[in-house]
């Protein structure tokens, strides 16, 4: 009996998180019309998600995962996510589903309501420091939840930039008043990070432009990495070239950069 692991477009985690499910699960990844259009998302956002999903599917396939992938070009693209999922469930006679927690509450309810008749392994998301139960426990411990107090608690609980007495490194919990500087006119900015556009992005640019023509933006100006290799290189570039002055200028917006 086959099982299905549902992977959503914002759950493209390192394949190591999926490894223990590789041998007995099919991995279902679906480009979904409703998720692209429930708001008039900028074309760049749609292109980013779709191209990244395709690159992620390639990554899984190279590691011998068995992937069911539903493309925007397919005739049933505008059918609901649930309908497309259940076509595969019925076709493969699937009785068990695995997936990570869904952060979109409306979509989560829709999915869980429809999966009630199947065995469901609902897994803690690796996307966050805390579990859902951690946060519920915190809410039960305080009379009024404040972001600043929760932030301090996280720093202490996870030993992030605190000393042996759980006091903040640097003497303050927040340096917000020091990170709102404008970029000086004569500052030397690092050269922009460059990377090669993937074939998926090239193909999808025209498709997104046509199918979502009423959405804002132009795909020709898309500039974002869409696969793990380029994104990790971009992070290395940021740590090497930009982090030194990031704190001072993190709120600055400037056409030079």
Mark where each language-model region is.
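Beta-rich, aromatic/charged-enriched effector core domains that present basic-aromatic interfaces
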Residues: 78-224
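Gly/Thr-rich phosphate-binding loop signature of adenosyl cofactor/nucleotide-binding cores
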Residues: 230-257
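N-terminal beta-strand-loop-alpha-helix module at the start
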Residues: 1-72
